[in-house]
């Protein structure tokens, strides 16, 4: 409750701002600049902007009828500016964001308390369209205030000035290209880049205005995304259903073909081809079950009588068009209740529609191949982009007196020292054997485990093999060789597998998983592991993980058939890394002497992530995962996972999840952590305040619920991978690997970072393909008062503790594990989602039950809970 005076009468306009929460958390200022590591000269794809110290005038635009796409809104405003030049706009060049906001460099002749209403006519294909546009003054946006913020004289960067500058810089590109988010795309001229399934790659560029130390910067990057190919719907259908040509499809579609086709085309816009120049556009809402020859609709005759007429007959009578493919279904377009049907052959897919549905595995790999660029090539492409964009000749940018430098920004980075990695030795062979403690030193983010043994290897005495690959492809000889090789490699790694598997059988289909696993659990006492061999991508995988992780609490390790047919030391060694950890072993640890001071007291590292279902899927829940370290190395982690509201970014049950992890930490170590380091993945800048407010309070609440005075210091760090900052070596000799990337450990916290807050870029991994993307870390809260060096070194070291490989990874292990846990929970939900998605109109009551069923489905078995089942 807010305390205060009695009620005050407020005029109805303008709308008052929403009340802020009783207190807001403010991110900490940057404590200092890092100095650790050797310096390296870099260039960043940031271009300095020269901003005048003027005022910009902000107006609100209201277009009726509403809900036009931005492209249409832009046309309306452009027509308005031309048409009312004499009365209102004169020589001014306003910029518009496509929604509500219009900015001018000089004020318009509109009184501040008045609203001007104009009528704008857009010439249409059939008839002209008339719109009513209202303009009213909103505010003056001071660019002087921006200068004050960048130089540290103001505590925070005014959001409205950045928004205004962004609109100025995006106005012309938005008219020329197809905008998607903060990027602009255009169809590749001359050379198509097909992805299959009616999709293709469009190339473009990302552009955003960013505040940095002392200067505003323009961040420019090359960008690519999937669009639907503009083509006849018949051809689109052939691509989706893998028909060589339409001629081979003389029969109606089967149910499964129709369902697959519907899934792909639903929601897309098509244009008709049978009405000459009038290419009306419609949005597809469904595909009919019946072919055009049998699909009927109520047709009103001239006499006023209504008769049922087939689509094929209607096109013959009305349009003198005999359908070539009457055996194919129709598209249902517009509103579902209106029964508007179009034969496939009179429709084309409208150009410029971005594909938001999930790409298939093949499409994803084609996309990566088409878009991967070595760092020097990408640098050259970005420079070329800047030259062709030529912002300094853009009339709208010049109108506001803005200049942009043509060259990338020079930045001094630092390459941090990698930590030493400690392995173990043969402890169980002979009591007096020397402990072969081996230390590995990463070089360019990679180290070698050869001649070394796990820090703590597990002895495997009882294990089983279940082969779901066909016996003729994966023979008994293959299985025998695989078993021998795995035992040899595991022995060398210090994880001895004693004896042959207690069970080795062939099986088929997901339905046989649970009965087989129950038999194994009941028959073989002390069974530690089931190795499952899979024939490529199959539903068996999801079922193995569901049964193993959530139903019976059994450790499982899946192996692809091709890796059994041809074993390599590398794949077997990688298998051992995963198996040892799943069974409670420790592969390696950070050398204790080299760890940062934060390890001097009990500390828990938490990683958190929320994964959302693919776009266009409105039913599936989002999944929140939080993992916590369970030892001082830190090496072992425990996981908690929840389903939550569809596309909800804030972790709703965080307090209970953190409480569970703190209890587990205490059980594992007999210590209460005095510090909590929380790495939060997957939050965009616009959500910082909201996420921080809710989640920091949730972590505090978890502590206080355990003990009234328990107040460990919390450091809350957001980890971001989905940004467009790229760093390039200035000196050719510093470039690493085939792709010419920056070295692993490269850190930047000056010039391109936030003017006042605590953030930094760290590229902790060695780039293998394409240009490395440094991770961006933004500290939103810090009770522990880290210096820049301490936090940067700690973060870099945690990137070396990921158990699945002997390389440093691109984000700290706890954040990576949270991602794996959420991803695994998707598999646990597979059949539950299928069940609950069958009927789309479920009542409110059953939804509550569905929610409970989903929550239960991701609940991991008690025996699995304390293991790293997700590794």
Swiss-Prot record:
Q: Where is the PAZ domain?
A: 232-351
PROSITE patterns, from UniProt? PAZ (PS50821), PIWI (PS50822)
Residues covered by region (Interaction with GW182 family members): 599-602, 662-672
In terms of SMART domains, this protein maps to: DUF1785, PAZ, Piwi
**Name assigned to this protein:** Protein argonaute-2
Any idea of its EC number? 3.1.26.n2
User: What residues does a divalent metal cation bind to?
Assistant: 609, 681, 819
Q: According to the UniProt entry, which residue ranges have a biased composition of type Polar residues?
A: 839-850
Q: Provide the taxonomic classification.
A: Eukaryota, Metazoa, Chordata, Craniata, Vertebrata
